Protein backbone atom coordinates (compact mmCIF):
# COMPACT_ATOMS: atom_id res chain seq x y z
CA UNK A 1 0.00 0.00 0.00
CA UNK A 2 1.43 3.35 -1.05
CA UNK A 3 1.06 6.25 1.33
CA UNK A 4 0.37 9.68 -0.09
CA UNK A 5 -0.04 12.96 1.69
CA UNK A 6 -3.04 12.41 3.91
CA UNK A 7 -5.31 10.53 1.57
CA UNK A 8 -5.53 7.22 -0.20
CA UNK A 9 -5.08 6.76 -3.91
CA UNK A 10 -5.76 3.49 -5.69
CA UNK A 11 -2.97 2.18 -7.86
CA UNK A 12 -4.47 -0.47 -10.06
CA UNK A 13 -2.62 -3.72 -10.54
CA UNK A 14 -0.82 -3.73 -13.85
CA UNK A 15 0.06 -6.91 -15.63
CA UNK A 16 2.87 -7.40 -18.06
CA UNK A 17 3.86 -10.47 -20.03
CA UNK A 18 6.17 -11.65 -17.28
CA UNK A 19 4.37 -11.09 -14.04
CA UNK A 20 1.98 -9.13 -11.87
CA UNK A 21 3.11 -5.89 -10.41
CA UNK A 22 1.30 -4.86 -7.26
CA UNK A 23 0.69 -1.17 -7.56
CA UNK A 24 -1.06 -1.10 -4.24
CA UNK A 25 -2.80 1.62 -2.34
CA UNK A 26 -1.60 4.93 -1.32
CA UNK A 27 -2.03 5.86 2.20
CA UNK A 28 -2.89 8.83 3.97
CA UNK A 29 -3.32 10.26 7.26
CA UNK A 30 -2.56 6.76 6.80
CA UNK A 31 -3.25 -0.11 4.05
CA UNK A 32 -3.27 -1.82 6.31
CA UNK A 33 -2.29 -2.23 9.92
CA UNK A 34 -3.22 0.80 12.35
CA UNK A 35 -5.48 4.03 14.49
CA UNK A 36 -7.49 5.02 17.37
CA UNK A 37 -8.07 5.14 21.05
CA UNK A 38 -9.04 7.11 24.02
CA UNK A 39 -7.38 9.09 26.71
CA UNK A 40 -4.09 10.88 26.69
CA UNK A 41 -1.24 9.90 24.42
CA UNK A 42 0.48 7.90 27.13
CA UNK A 43 -2.38 5.49 27.73
CA UNK A 44 -3.56 2.63 25.57
CA UNK A 45 -6.06 4.83 23.84
CA UNK A 46 -9.16 2.88 24.76
CA UNK A 47 -12.51 4.32 25.74
CA UNK A 48 -14.76 1.66 27.19
CA UNK A 49 -17.34 3.59 29.18
CA UNK A 50 -20.91 2.82 28.18
CA UNK A 51 -20.90 0.44 25.28
CA UNK A 52 -24.55 -0.54 24.97
CA UNK A 53 -26.41 -1.00 21.70
CA UNK A 54 -28.24 1.85 20.02
CA UNK A 55 -27.74 5.39 18.81
CA UNK A 56 -26.22 6.88 15.67
CA UNK A 57 -22.50 7.06 14.96
CA UNK A 58 -21.13 9.63 12.48
CA UNK A 59 -17.96 9.06 10.46
CA UNK A 60 -16.41 12.30 9.15
CA UNK A 61 -13.91 12.16 6.30
CA UNK A 62 -12.39 14.11 3.44
CA UNK A 63 -11.49 11.38 0.96
CA UNK A 64 -14.37 9.68 -0.83
CA UNK A 65 -14.57 5.92 -1.01
CA UNK A 66 -13.53 4.97 -4.54
CA UNK A 67 -14.96 1.45 -4.37
CA UNK A 68 -17.44 -0.38 -2.14
CA UNK A 69 -17.43 -3.50 -4.32
CA UNK A 70 -15.50 -6.01 -2.17
CA UNK A 71 -13.33 -7.30 -5.02
CA UNK A 72 -12.41 -3.73 -6.04
CA UNK A 73 -11.59 -2.35 -2.60
CA UNK A 74 -7.92 -1.78 -1.83
CA UNK A 75 -7.79 1.11 0.63
CA UNK A 76 -6.96 0.38 4.26
CA UNK A 77 -9.74 2.46 5.79
CA UNK A 78 -12.45 1.07 3.51
CA UNK A 79 -11.29 -2.53 3.84
CA UNK A 80 -11.53 -2.17 7.61
CA UNK A 81 -14.86 -0.32 7.64
CA UNK A 82 -16.76 -2.55 5.25
CA UNK A 83 -15.25 -5.67 6.78
CA UNK A 84 -16.84 -4.68 10.07
CA UNK A 85 -20.18 -3.43 8.69
CA UNK A 86 -21.33 -5.25 5.56
CA UNK A 87 -18.87 -7.87 4.30
CA UNK A 88 -18.04 -11.00 6.24
CA UNK A 89 -15.06 -13.15 5.25
CA UNK A 90 -14.06 -16.75 5.79
CA UNK A 91 -11.76 -15.39 8.47
CA UNK A 92 -11.49 -11.91 9.94
CA UNK A 93 -8.96 -9.94 11.93
CA UNK A 94 -10.01 -9.66 15.59
CA UNK A 95 -11.38 -6.72 17.56
CA UNK A 96 -8.53 -6.08 19.99
CA UNK A 97 -5.89 -3.59 21.09
CA UNK A 98 -3.42 -6.38 21.84
CA UNK A 99 -0.84 -6.28 19.03
CA UNK A 100 0.11 -9.88 19.78
CA UNK A 101 -3.46 -10.94 18.94
CA UNK A 102 -4.32 -8.38 16.26
CA UNK A 103 -2.24 -10.11 13.59
CA UNK A 104 -3.85 -13.52 14.08
CA UNK A 105 -7.04 -14.25 12.08
CA UNK A 106 -10.15 -15.64 13.72
CA UNK A 107 -13.05 -17.58 12.22
CA UNK A 108 -15.86 -15.52 10.67
CA UNK A 109 -18.00 -17.23 8.02
CA UNK A 110 -15.86 -20.35 8.36
CA UNK A 111 -15.92 -22.80 11.24
CA UNK A 112 -12.19 -22.31 11.86
CA UNK A 113 -9.20 -20.42 10.48
CA UNK A 114 -8.61 -22.89 7.67
CA UNK A 115 -6.72 -26.11 7.11
CA UNK A 116 -3.42 -25.87 5.24
CA UNK A 117 -1.94 -28.86 3.41
CA UNK A 118 0.54 -29.75 0.66
CA UNK A 119 3.19 -27.52 2.17
CA UNK A 120 1.00 -24.43 1.99
CA UNK A 121 -0.18 -25.00 -1.59
CA UNK A 122 -3.69 -26.00 -0.53
CA UNK A 123 -6.17 -24.43 1.90
CA UNK A 124 -9.69 -25.58 2.85
CA UNK A 125 -12.48 -23.87 4.80
CA UNK A 126 -15.98 -25.00 5.80
CA UNK A 127 -18.88 -22.54 6.05
CA UNK A 128 -20.86 -22.19 9.27
CA UNK A 129 -24.56 -22.96 9.36
CA UNK A 130 -26.98 -20.04 9.47
CA UNK A 131 -24.91 -17.37 7.71
CA UNK A 132 -27.13 -15.35 5.36
CA UNK A 133 -27.33 -12.48 2.89
CA UNK A 134 -29.41 -9.40 3.64
CA UNK A 135 -32.39 -10.93 1.77
CA UNK A 136 -32.33 -14.02 3.99
CA UNK A 137 -30.79 -16.46 1.50
CA UNK A 138 -27.95 -18.67 2.70
CA UNK A 139 -24.35 -17.84 1.85
CA UNK A 140 -22.98 -20.77 -0.13
CA UNK A 141 -19.63 -22.15 -1.14
CA UNK A 142 -20.46 -21.14 -4.72
CA UNK A 143 -20.85 -17.52 -3.56
CA UNK A 144 -17.30 -17.63 -2.21
CA UNK A 145 -16.02 -19.12 -5.44
CA UNK A 146 -17.88 -16.60 -7.58
CA UNK A 147 -16.54 -13.69 -5.53
CA UNK A 148 -12.95 -14.71 -6.15
CA UNK A 149 -13.60 -15.37 -9.83
CA UNK A 150 -14.44 -11.69 -10.30
CA UNK A 151 -10.84 -10.70 -9.51
CA UNK A 152 -9.76 -12.37 -12.76
CA UNK A 153 -11.94 -10.01 -14.82
CA UNK A 154 -9.28 -7.32 -14.76
CA UNK A 155 -10.96 -5.38 -17.56
CA UNK A 156 -14.12 -4.98 -15.46
CA UNK A 157 -13.25 -5.44 -11.78
CA UNK A 158 -10.46 -2.88 -11.52
CA UNK A 159 -8.61 -1.32 -8.62
CA UNK A 160 -8.47 -4.29 -6.27
CA UNK A 161 -5.63 -6.60 -5.25
CA UNK A 162 -4.75 -9.32 -7.74
CA UNK A 163 -2.74 -11.69 -5.57
CA UNK A 164 -5.03 -14.55 -6.61
CA UNK A 165 -3.99 -14.17 -10.24
CA UNK A 166 -0.40 -14.96 -9.35
CA UNK A 167 -1.05 -17.62 -6.69
CA UNK A 168 -4.03 -19.70 -7.83
CA UNK A 169 -3.08 -22.84 -9.75
CA UNK A 170 -4.60 -21.62 -13.01
CA UNK A 171 -2.53 -22.22 -16.18
CA UNK A 172 -1.00 -19.21 -17.87
CA UNK A 173 -0.46 -18.24 -21.48
CA UNK A 174 2.02 -15.50 -22.36
CA UNK A 175 2.39 -14.77 -18.65
CA UNK A 176 -1.34 -14.26 -18.00
CA UNK A 177 -4.00 -16.63 -16.60
CA UNK A 178 -6.05 -18.44 -19.24
CA UNK A 179 -9.10 -17.65 -17.09
CA UNK A 180 -10.49 -14.14 -17.56
CA UNK A 181 -13.28 -14.06 -15.00
CA UNK A 182 -16.98 -14.99 -14.92
CA UNK A 183 -18.08 -12.64 -17.69
CA UNK A 184 -16.23 -14.69 -20.31
CA UNK A 185 -16.24 -18.44 -20.92
CA UNK A 186 -12.53 -19.04 -21.52
CA UNK A 187 -10.64 -21.04 -18.89
CA UNK A 188 -13.61 -21.80 -16.63
CA UNK A 189 -12.64 -25.47 -16.27
CA UNK A 190 -9.13 -24.47 -15.20
CA UNK A 191 -10.50 -22.11 -12.55
CA UNK A 192 -12.87 -24.84 -11.32
CA UNK A 193 -9.89 -27.12 -10.67
CA UNK A 194 -8.12 -24.44 -8.65
CA UNK A 195 -11.18 -23.44 -6.59
CA UNK A 196 -13.45 -26.36 -5.77
CA UNK A 197 -16.64 -26.68 -3.72
CA UNK A 198 -17.79 -29.80 -1.89
CA UNK A 199 -20.97 -28.99 -0.02
CA UNK A 200 -20.05 -26.24 2.43
CA UNK A 201 -16.31 -26.77 2.03
CA UNK A 202 -14.21 -24.68 -0.35
CA UNK A 203 -10.67 -25.66 -1.32
CA UNK A 204 -8.09 -23.38 -2.90
CA UNK A 205 -5.13 -24.84 -4.81
CA UNK A 206 -2.09 -22.62 -5.35
CA UNK A 207 0.88 -22.94 -7.69
CA UNK A 208 3.28 -22.17 -4.82
CA UNK A 209 3.20 -22.17 -1.06
CA UNK A 210 1.01 -19.50 0.53
CA UNK A 211 1.41 -20.16 4.27
CA UNK A 212 -0.18 -16.84 5.25
CA UNK A 213 -3.16 -17.12 2.91
CA UNK A 214 -5.64 -16.88 5.78
CA UNK A 215 -4.07 -13.55 6.73
CA UNK A 216 -4.66 -12.31 3.19
CA UNK A 217 -8.26 -13.56 3.25
CA UNK A 218 -8.86 -11.79 6.56
CA UNK A 219 -7.22 -8.50 5.59
CA UNK A 220 -8.53 -8.06 2.04
CA UNK A 221 -12.08 -8.30 0.72
CA UNK A 222 -11.03 -9.99 -2.54
CA UNK A 223 -11.83 -13.45 -1.15
CA UNK A 224 -15.24 -12.47 0.21
CA UNK A 225 -18.41 -14.06 -1.18
CA UNK A 226 -20.41 -12.36 -3.92
CA UNK A 227 -23.78 -13.52 -5.18
CA UNK A 228 -23.93 -14.00 -8.94
CA UNK A 229 -27.49 -12.70 -9.27
CA UNK A 230 -26.41 -9.41 -7.66
CA UNK A 231 -23.45 -8.83 -9.97
CA UNK A 232 -23.74 -5.96 -12.42
CA UNK A 233 -20.05 -5.81 -13.27
CA UNK A 234 -18.55 -2.33 -13.06
CA UNK A 235 -21.99 -0.93 -12.22
CA UNK A 236 -21.79 -2.73 -8.86
CA UNK A 237 -19.13 -0.36 -7.56
CA UNK A 238 -21.36 1.26 -4.92
CA UNK A 239 -24.13 -1.36 -4.84
CA UNK A 240 -23.58 -2.86 -1.39
CA UNK A 241 -25.25 -6.26 -0.89
CA UNK A 242 -24.62 -7.14 2.72
CA UNK A 243 -24.05 -10.28 4.73
CA UNK A 244 -22.83 -8.37 7.79
CA UNK A 245 -24.57 -6.64 10.70
CA UNK A 246 -25.47 -3.53 8.64
CA UNK A 247 -26.89 -2.80 5.21
CA UNK A 248 -26.84 0.33 3.09
CA UNK A 249 -29.99 2.44 3.40
CA UNK A 250 -30.82 3.87 0.00
CA UNK A 251 -27.77 4.62 -2.14
CA UNK A 252 -24.21 5.70 -1.59
CA UNK A 253 -23.31 9.11 -3.04
CA UNK A 254 -19.63 9.47 -3.84
CA UNK A 255 -18.26 12.61 -2.25
CA UNK A 256 -21.20 12.87 0.15
CA UNK A 257 -21.46 9.44 1.79
CA UNK A 258 -24.25 7.15 2.90
CA UNK A 259 -26.11 5.62 5.83
CA UNK A 260 -25.96 2.07 7.15
CA UNK A 261 -28.75 0.54 9.26
CA UNK A 262 -29.16 -2.84 10.89
CA UNK A 263 -29.47 -5.92 8.66
CA UNK A 264 -32.43 -7.89 10.01
CA UNK A 265 -31.17 -11.15 8.47
CA UNK A 266 -27.81 -11.02 10.22
CA UNK A 267 -27.49 -13.50 13.09
CA UNK A 268 -25.07 -12.27 15.75
CA UNK A 269 -24.83 -15.81 17.14
CA UNK A 270 -22.78 -16.78 14.07
CA UNK A 271 -20.36 -13.89 14.59
CA UNK A 272 -17.75 -13.87 17.33
CA UNK A 273 -15.98 -10.77 16.02
CA UNK A 274 -18.25 -7.73 15.65
CA UNK A 275 -20.09 -6.02 18.53
CA UNK A 276 -22.28 -3.99 16.11
CA UNK A 277 -23.31 -1.46 18.77
CA UNK A 278 -24.80 1.58 16.93
CA UNK A 279 -28.22 1.25 15.32
CA UNK A 280 -27.14 3.53 12.50
CA UNK A 281 -23.82 4.69 11.05
CA UNK A 282 -23.74 7.82 8.87
CA UNK A 283 -20.72 8.52 6.65
CA UNK A 284 -20.11 12.14 5.68
CA UNK A 285 -17.49 12.67 2.96
CA UNK A 286 -15.93 15.75 1.39
CA UNK A 287 -15.02 17.66 4.56
CA UNK A 288 -11.60 19.24 4.96
CA UNK A 289 -9.22 18.11 7.70
CA UNK A 290 -9.46 21.53 9.32
CA UNK A 291 -13.27 21.54 9.35
CA UNK A 292 -13.47 18.00 10.70
CA UNK A 293 -11.06 18.61 13.54
CA UNK A 294 -12.50 22.01 14.40
CA UNK A 295 -15.92 20.37 14.72
CA UNK A 296 -14.54 17.58 16.89
CA UNK A 297 -12.75 20.08 19.11
CA UNK A 298 -16.01 22.05 19.51
CA UNK A 299 -17.85 18.79 20.32
CA UNK A 300 -21.44 19.92 19.78
CA UNK A 301 -24.60 18.35 18.37
CA UNK A 302 -24.11 15.20 16.27
CA UNK A 303 -20.34 15.71 16.38
CA UNK A 304 -20.39 14.37 19.93
CA UNK A 305 -21.16 11.01 18.27
CA UNK A 306 -18.47 11.32 15.58
CA UNK A 307 -15.20 9.63 14.67
CA UNK A 308 -12.78 10.39 11.85
CA UNK A 309 -9.86 9.04 9.84
CA UNK A 310 -8.34 12.52 9.40
CA UNK A 311 -5.38 13.46 11.55
CA UNK A 312 -5.22 16.68 13.55
CA UNK A 313 -3.19 19.21 11.51
CA UNK A 314 -0.01 20.42 13.28
CA UNK A 315 -1.44 23.94 13.29
CA UNK A 316 -4.19 22.70 15.67
CA UNK A 317 -1.98 20.78 18.10
CA UNK A 318 -2.15 23.62 20.60
CA UNK A 319 -5.95 23.30 20.82
CA UNK A 320 -5.84 19.63 21.85
CA UNK A 321 -5.48 20.04 25.60
CA UNK A 322 -7.36 19.08 28.77
CA UNK A 323 -10.62 17.24 28.14
CA UNK A 324 -10.13 17.52 24.38
CA UNK A 325 -6.86 15.58 24.74
CA UNK A 326 -8.82 12.90 26.61
CA UNK A 327 -10.73 12.39 23.36
CA UNK A 328 -7.58 11.96 21.29
CA UNK A 329 -5.47 9.01 20.28
CA UNK A 330 -1.95 8.93 18.88
CA UNK A 331 -1.06 5.36 17.88
CA UNK A 332 1.63 4.06 15.59
CA UNK A 333 0.43 3.46 12.03
CA UNK A 334 1.57 0.66 9.70
CA UNK A 335 3.17 3.06 7.27
CA UNK A 336 6.83 3.85 6.72
CA UNK A 337 7.96 6.84 4.67
CA UNK A 338 11.28 6.54 2.89
CA UNK A 339 13.57 7.91 0.16
CA UNK A 340 14.85 6.03 -2.87
CA UNK A 341 17.92 7.06 -4.86
CA UNK A 342 17.44 6.79 -8.62
CA UNK A 343 19.92 4.07 -9.58
CA UNK A 344 19.84 5.22 -13.19
CA UNK A 345 21.37 8.54 -12.14
CA UNK A 346 23.00 8.02 -8.74
CA UNK A 347 25.29 5.22 -9.90
CA UNK A 348 28.20 5.78 -7.51
CA UNK A 349 27.64 3.77 -4.30
CA UNK A 350 29.72 6.22 -2.25
CA UNK A 351 27.47 9.09 -3.33
CA UNK A 352 24.42 7.08 -2.26
CA UNK A 353 26.14 6.29 1.04
CA UNK A 354 26.89 10.00 1.48
CA UNK A 355 23.22 10.80 0.88
CA UNK A 356 22.30 8.33 3.60
CA UNK A 357 24.82 9.86 5.99
CA UNK A 358 23.58 13.39 5.27
CA UNK A 359 19.89 12.55 5.76
CA UNK A 360 18.44 13.70 9.08
CA UNK A 361 15.28 11.89 10.11
CA UNK A 362 15.09 14.19 13.10
CA UNK A 363 14.94 17.32 10.92
CA UNK A 364 12.28 15.76 8.68
CA UNK A 365 10.17 14.70 11.67
CA UNK A 366 10.44 18.08 13.40
CA UNK A 367 9.35 19.86 10.22
CA UNK A 368 6.40 17.48 9.85
CA UNK A 369 4.88 17.98 13.29
CA UNK A 370 7.20 16.18 15.68
CA UNK A 371 6.52 13.13 17.77
CA UNK A 372 2.75 13.33 17.45
CA UNK A 373 3.10 12.80 13.70
CA UNK A 374 6.01 10.36 13.44
CA UNK A 375 8.52 8.12 15.14
CA UNK A 376 11.97 7.26 13.85
CA UNK A 377 12.23 4.37 11.40
CA UNK A 378 15.10 1.90 11.22
CA UNK A 379 13.80 -0.25 8.37
CA UNK A 380 11.24 -0.15 5.59
CA UNK A 381 9.58 -3.03 7.42
CA UNK A 382 7.23 -1.73 10.10
CA UNK A 383 7.91 -2.98 13.65
CA UNK A 384 4.36 -4.37 13.72
CA UNK A 385 5.56 -7.10 11.33
CA UNK A 386 7.27 -8.83 14.21
CA UNK A 387 8.44 -11.94 12.33
CA UNK A 388 10.50 -9.92 9.82
CA UNK A 389 11.39 -6.69 11.61
CA UNK A 390 14.86 -5.85 12.87
CA UNK A 391 16.72 -2.57 13.07
CA UNK A 392 18.73 -2.49 9.86
CA UNK A 393 22.44 -2.32 10.79
CA UNK A 394 23.25 -0.67 7.44
CA UNK A 395 21.65 2.57 8.64
CA UNK A 396 24.56 3.42 10.91
CA UNK A 397 24.74 7.21 10.96
CA UNK A 398 22.07 7.93 13.55
CA UNK A 399 18.69 9.58 13.15
CA UNK A 400 20.31 13.01 12.95
CA UNK A 401 22.72 12.02 10.20
CA UNK A 402 26.47 12.56 10.10
CA UNK A 403 27.47 15.55 7.96
CA UNK A 404 31.23 15.09 8.34
CA UNK A 405 31.03 11.45 7.28
CA UNK A 406 28.92 12.46 4.29
CA UNK A 407 31.55 15.04 3.25
CA UNK A 408 34.25 12.39 3.55
CA UNK A 409 32.31 9.94 1.38
CA UNK A 410 31.68 12.55 -1.31
CA UNK A 411 35.39 13.37 -1.37
CA UNK A 412 36.24 9.67 -1.73
CA UNK A 413 33.72 9.45 -4.57
CA UNK A 414 35.48 12.30 -6.36
CA UNK A 415 32.24 14.31 -6.31
CA UNK A 416 32.45 16.81 -3.44
CA UNK A 417 29.49 18.88 -4.71
CA UNK A 418 27.14 16.67 -6.76
CA UNK A 419 23.90 18.21 -8.06
CA UNK A 420 20.75 16.28 -7.10
CA UNK A 421 17.03 16.80 -7.63
CA UNK A 422 14.57 15.68 -4.93
CA UNK A 423 11.12 14.83 -6.30
CA UNK A 424 8.41 14.63 -3.65
CA UNK A 425 4.65 14.77 -3.12
CA UNK A 426 3.89 18.31 -2.02
CA UNK A 427 1.18 20.91 -2.11
CA UNK A 428 0.99 21.57 1.64
CA UNK A 429 2.98 23.83 3.97
CA UNK A 430 4.06 20.76 5.96
CA UNK A 431 5.45 18.86 2.97
CA UNK A 432 7.31 21.97 1.82
CA UNK A 433 8.87 22.44 5.26
CA UNK A 434 9.97 18.81 5.32
CA UNK A 435 11.56 19.00 1.87
CA UNK A 436 13.37 22.19 2.88
CA UNK A 437 14.67 20.47 6.02
CA UNK A 438 16.24 17.69 3.95
CA UNK A 439 17.66 20.19 1.47
CA UNK A 440 19.37 22.00 4.32
CA UNK A 441 21.10 18.91 5.73
CA UNK A 442 22.12 17.65 2.30
CA UNK A 443 23.61 21.00 1.31
CA UNK A 444 25.62 21.13 4.53
CA UNK A 445 27.28 17.91 3.33
CA UNK A 446 28.08 19.38 -0.08
CA UNK A 447 25.15 18.38 -2.28
CA UNK A 448 23.63 21.02 -4.56
CA UNK A 449 19.91 20.40 -4.19
CA UNK A 450 16.96 21.26 -6.41
CA UNK A 451 13.47 20.60 -5.02
CA UNK A 452 10.90 19.19 -7.46
CA UNK A 453 7.47 19.46 -5.82
CA UNK A 454 4.58 17.52 -7.42
CA UNK A 455 1.11 18.63 -6.35
CA UNK A 456 -1.57 17.31 -8.72
CA UNK A 457 -0.41 13.74 -9.16
CA UNK A 458 2.54 11.78 -7.88
CA UNK A 459 2.94 8.02 -8.14
CA UNK A 460 2.03 7.84 -11.81
CA UNK A 461 4.81 10.38 -12.44
CA UNK A 462 7.59 8.67 -10.50
CA UNK A 463 6.59 5.27 -11.90
CA UNK A 464 7.91 6.46 -15.25
CA UNK A 465 11.35 4.82 -15.69
CA UNK A 466 12.63 8.16 -16.99
CA UNK A 467 11.10 10.26 -14.22
CA UNK A 468 12.88 13.51 -13.44
CA UNK A 469 14.70 13.12 -10.16
CA UNK A 470 17.77 11.74 -8.40
CA UNK A 471 15.84 10.98 -5.21
CA UNK A 472 12.17 10.17 -4.75
CA UNK A 473 9.92 10.12 -1.68
CA UNK A 474 7.72 7.07 -1.07
CA UNK A 475 5.45 5.61 1.59
CA UNK A 476 4.33 2.02 2.12
CA UNK A 477 2.35 -0.23 4.44
CA UNK A 478 1.82 -3.99 4.37
CA UNK A 479 -1.28 -5.45 2.74
CA UNK A 480 -1.46 -7.92 5.62
CA UNK A 481 0.93 -8.68 8.51
CA UNK A 482 3.72 -10.15 6.38
CA UNK A 483 6.90 -8.76 4.83
CA UNK A 484 5.93 -10.66 1.68
CA UNK A 485 3.70 -7.67 0.92
CA UNK A 486 6.53 -5.18 1.39
CA UNK A 487 9.95 -6.29 0.11
CA UNK A 488 8.92 -8.03 -3.16
CA UNK A 489 6.41 -5.31 -4.02
CA UNK A 490 9.05 -2.60 -3.71
CA UNK A 491 12.34 -4.20 -4.74
CA UNK A 492 11.75 -7.27 -6.92
CA UNK A 493 12.88 -5.85 -10.26
CA UNK A 494 11.29 -8.73 -12.17
CA UNK A 495 7.74 -7.76 -11.27
CA UNK A 496 8.33 -4.02 -11.33
CA UNK A 497 10.72 -2.91 -14.04
CA UNK A 498 9.40 -2.78 -17.59
CA UNK A 499 9.97 -0.47 -20.54
CA UNK A 500 6.97 1.63 -19.57
CA UNK A 501 6.90 1.46 -15.77
CA UNK A 502 9.07 0.84 -12.75
CA UNK A 503 6.04 -0.22 -10.69
CA UNK A 504 6.80 0.39 -7.01
CA UNK A 505 10.54 0.09 -7.61
CA UNK A 506 10.69 3.86 -8.01
CA UNK A 507 14.50 3.99 -7.87
CA UNK A 508 14.99 1.42 -10.66
CA UNK A 509 16.86 -0.84 -8.24
CA UNK A 510 17.90 -4.23 -9.62
CA UNK A 511 19.78 -6.94 -7.74
CA UNK A 512 20.00 -10.59 -8.77
CA UNK A 513 21.08 -11.41 -5.21
CA UNK A 514 17.99 -9.78 -3.73
CA UNK A 515 15.70 -11.43 -6.29
CA UNK A 516 17.18 -14.82 -5.45
CA UNK A 517 16.56 -14.30 -1.73
CA UNK A 518 12.99 -13.16 -2.48
CA UNK A 519 12.45 -16.50 -4.24
CA UNK A 520 13.83 -18.32 -1.20
CA UNK A 521 11.42 -16.45 1.08
CA UNK A 522 8.51 -17.33 -1.22
CA UNK A 523 9.34 -21.03 -0.83
CA UNK A 524 9.33 -20.87 2.97
CA UNK A 525 6.53 -22.91 4.51
CA UNK A 526 6.04 -20.65 7.53
CA UNK A 527 5.79 -16.92 8.12
CA UNK A 528 8.58 -17.13 10.71
CA UNK A 529 10.99 -18.83 8.31
CA UNK A 530 10.24 -16.30 5.60
CA UNK A 531 10.72 -13.49 8.09
CA UNK A 532 14.32 -14.50 8.78
CA UNK A 533 15.08 -14.35 5.06
CA UNK A 534 13.45 -10.93 4.74
CA UNK A 535 15.73 -9.62 7.50
CA UNK A 536 18.72 -10.63 5.37
CA UNK A 537 17.20 -9.03 2.29
CA UNK A 538 16.56 -5.82 4.19
CA UNK A 539 20.20 -5.71 5.31
CA UNK A 540 21.36 -6.09 1.70
CA UNK A 541 18.99 -3.32 0.58
CA UNK A 542 20.43 -1.06 3.25
CA UNK A 543 24.00 -1.82 2.22
CA UNK A 544 23.14 -0.90 -1.37
CA UNK A 545 21.23 2.19 -0.14
CA UNK A 546 18.25 0.97 -2.15
CA UNK A 547 16.20 3.10 0.25
CA UNK A 548 16.65 5.46 3.19
CA UNK A 549 14.02 5.28 5.97
CA UNK A 550 12.53 8.61 7.06
CA UNK A 551 9.97 7.77 9.72
CA UNK A 552 7.05 5.63 10.73
CA UNK A 553 3.82 7.58 10.66
CA UNK A 554 1.57 8.06 13.67
CA UNK A 555 -2.12 8.90 13.67
CA UNK A 556 -3.37 11.78 15.79
CA UNK A 557 -7.14 11.44 15.82
CA UNK A 558 -10.01 13.00 17.75
CA UNK A 559 -13.49 11.68 18.51
CA UNK A 560 -16.70 13.03 20.03
CA UNK A 561 -17.41 12.88 23.76
CA UNK A 562 -20.28 10.38 23.36
CA UNK A 563 -18.17 7.78 21.54
CA UNK A 564 -17.59 4.59 23.53
CA UNK A 565 -15.49 1.42 23.18
CA UNK A 566 -12.95 3.20 21.00
CA UNK A 567 -9.79 1.14 20.56
CA UNK A 568 -6.47 1.36 18.73
CA UNK A 569 -6.53 -1.83 16.69
CA UNK A 570 -3.61 -2.71 14.39
CA UNK A 571 -6.04 -4.99 12.54
CA UNK A 572 -7.99 -1.97 11.25
CA UNK A 573 -4.86 0.03 10.37
CA UNK A 574 -5.52 2.06 13.53
CA UNK A 575 -8.60 3.60 11.96
CA UNK A 576 -11.72 3.62 14.17
CA UNK A 577 -12.69 -0.03 14.65
CA UNK A 578 -16.37 -0.07 13.73
CA UNK A 579 -16.61 -3.59 15.09
CA UNK A 580 -16.08 -2.19 18.57
CA UNK A 581 -17.13 1.45 18.74
CA UNK A 582 -20.48 2.61 20.11
CA UNK A 583 -22.17 5.81 21.30
CA UNK A 584 -23.79 6.92 24.55
CA UNK A 585 -27.55 7.16 24.26
Positions of the model-derived regions?
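Long beta-strand-rich cores associated with HINT superfamily self-processing modules
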Residues: 557-585
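Periplasmic-binding protein-like
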Residues: 69, 329, 344-386, 434, ...
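Extracytoplasmic/peripheral linker and loop segments enriched in polar/acidic and small residues
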Residues: 193-195, 451-459, 488-561, 585
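Surface-exposed binding/hinge segments that line
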Residues: 126, 145, 150-226
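Gly/Pro-rich hinge or "lid" segments in bacterial periplasmic/extracellular proteins
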Residues: 95-96, 205-276, 280
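Extracellular/periplasmic solute-recognition and catalytic clefts
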Residues: 249-261, 282-344, 367
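N-terminal lobe/hinge region of extracytoplasmic solute-binding protein
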Residues: 60-118, 241
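Structural transition elements
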Residues: 372-412, 427-433
Amino acid sequence: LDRLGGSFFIKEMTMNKKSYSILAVAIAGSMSLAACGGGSSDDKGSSSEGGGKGGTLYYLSKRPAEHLDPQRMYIGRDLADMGRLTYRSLVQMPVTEDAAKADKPVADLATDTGKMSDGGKKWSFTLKDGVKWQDGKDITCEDLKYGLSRSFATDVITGGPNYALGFLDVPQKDGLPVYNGPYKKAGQADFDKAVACDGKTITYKFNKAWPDFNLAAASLRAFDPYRKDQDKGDKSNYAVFSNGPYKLQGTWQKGKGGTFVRNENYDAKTDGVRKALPDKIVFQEGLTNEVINQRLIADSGNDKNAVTDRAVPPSMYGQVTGKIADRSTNPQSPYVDYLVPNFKKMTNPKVRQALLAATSQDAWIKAGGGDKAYTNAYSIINPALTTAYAKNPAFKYGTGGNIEEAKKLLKEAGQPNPSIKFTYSGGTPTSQKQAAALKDTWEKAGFKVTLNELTDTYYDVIQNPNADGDIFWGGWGADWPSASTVIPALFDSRINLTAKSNGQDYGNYKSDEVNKMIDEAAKATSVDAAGEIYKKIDKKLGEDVAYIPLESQKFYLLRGSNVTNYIDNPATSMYPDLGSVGVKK
